[in-house]
């Protein structure tokens, strides 16, 4: 277990505590971060306090099947007082085949959902991953960030907002000892939005060649 005490004169005081455990078939980590702001964050409150906590748990059910869960909570004295995020992953991996089912629910101003299924193939010089998901996020404060596979050097973590579907296909191919080809194609649509809030779909196609000498 570790702890950290932070002090910033006139701006912020904080303390953080974290820990981890690992036993047969189970392991987990936790962290708690508390902050006090001497200058109120809102004119509606006299005291500005914020506490963030997160717990991660992983269970190796059998050799090829793993269950992962992440629970995080944010408490504060101004604005929306609570923000609860619960995410679960069922992960299968055997030989060259992998699959993941994610279920993510977040509660802040309202309740939002992001779920997806992903299948993967990884063998020697070829990696391929396909993902299909849907999201229901009606408030910007309830947005959920999702890490998307992409080419090296690209940081792709979009904020899911609205009501829609998305599909992505990512490939990495080593075609020679010095060459790599990375490809990504994706499409996001919003068929479940109301007429007054309807948004156009978004399509992406990316090719990246890397040569190493």
Outline where the language-model segments fall.
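Exposed, low-structure sequence patches enriched in small/polar residues
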Residues: 1-213
């Amino acid at each position: 277990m570790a702890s950290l005490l932070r002090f910033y004169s006139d701006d912020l005081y904080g303390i953080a505590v974290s820990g981890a455990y690992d036993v047969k078939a189970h392991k987990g980590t936790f962290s708690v971060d508390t902050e006090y702001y001497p200058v109120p964050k809102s004119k509606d409150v006299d005291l500005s306090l914020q506490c963030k906590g997160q717990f991660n748990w992983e269970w190796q059910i059998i050799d090829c099947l793993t269950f992962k869960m992440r629970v995080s909570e944010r408490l504060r004295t101004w604005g929306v007082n609570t923000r609860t995020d619960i995410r679960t992953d069922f992960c299968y991996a055997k030989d060259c085949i992998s699959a993941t089912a994610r279920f993510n629910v977040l509660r802040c101003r309202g309740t939002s959902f992001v779920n997806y299924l992903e299948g993967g193939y990884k063998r020697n010089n070829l990696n391929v991953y396909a993902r299909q998901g849907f999201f229901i996020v009606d408030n910007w404060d309830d947005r959920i960030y999702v890490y998307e596979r992409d080419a090296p050097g690209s940081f792709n973590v979009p904020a899911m907002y609205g009501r829609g579907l998305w599909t992505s296909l990512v490939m990495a191919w080593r075609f020679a000892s010095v060459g790599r080809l990375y490809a990504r194609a994706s499409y996001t649509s919003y068929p479940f939005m109301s007429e007054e809030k309807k948004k156009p779909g978004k399509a992406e196609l990316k090719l990246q060649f890397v040569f190493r000498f």
